Amino acid sequence: MAQQINLEVVTPSGSIINKDVDIVNAPGSGGDFGVLANHAPLLSTIKIGALTYEIGEERNTLMVSGGFCEVSNNKITFLVESAEAKQDIDTDRAMKAKIRAEKRIAKHGLPSDEAYSDTRAEAALHRALIRLRVAQGL
């Protein structure tokens, strides 16, 4: 059996995953990256995206919100705002959030004081799209 790395994903609610895995692929703010056992120490910010990990032939995916990642001593720890496993994603809710965000973005001529709302709508759309992608196993 190949050497593994310990993966831990922590949200404000607590640790949701703590297991040994073969490989982790993460949505880093500077680009996606992969981590295997014995990886060099690393700190990275994490963007909204799909976090995947493999154990043997089994591949698992989580939707994660922004946060941080540390790789050290054969352990990779994610401190993220939220994390949802494929089976926990409510696709109806995600689709409604997608439609709502698209409607907000489609509004033209927003006053400058509403620019922040537009940015929030874009972030909401991105989260909804990632949730749908993870739920569909893409």
Curated annotation (Swiss-Prot):
Pfam families linked to this entry: ATP-synt_DE, ATP-synt_DE_N
Statement: the UniProt record of this protein carries the keyword Membrane: yes
Entry superkingdom: Bacteria
Keywords: ATP synthesis, Cell inner membrane, Cell membrane, CF(1), Hydrogen ion transport, Ion transport, Membrane, Transport
Record has Ion transport as a keyword: yes
CDD domains documented for this protein: F1-ATPase_delta (cd12152)
Compartments where found: Cell inner membrane
GO molecular function: ATP binding; proton-transporting ATP synthase activity, rotational mechanism
Major place of residence: membrane
Its membrane topology: Peripheral membrane protein
A GO term from the CC aspect: plasma membrane
PANTHER family: ATP SYNTHASE DELTA/EPSILON CHAIN, ATP SYNTHASE EPSILON CHAIN, CHLOROPLASTIC
Assembly information from the UniProt record: F-type ATPases have 2 components, CF(1) - the catalytic core - and CF(0) - the membrane proton channel. CF(1) has five subunits: alpha(3), beta(3), gamma(1), delta(1), epsilon(1). CF(0) has three main subunits: a, b and c.
Family: Belongs to the ATPase epsilon chain family.
HAMAP family membership: ATP_synth_epsil_bac
Function: Produces ATP from ADP in the presence of a proton gradient across the membrane.
Record NCBIfam families: ATP_synt_epsi (TIGR01216), PRK13446.1 (NF009980)
Protein name (Swiss-Prot/TrEMBL): ATP synthase epsilon chain
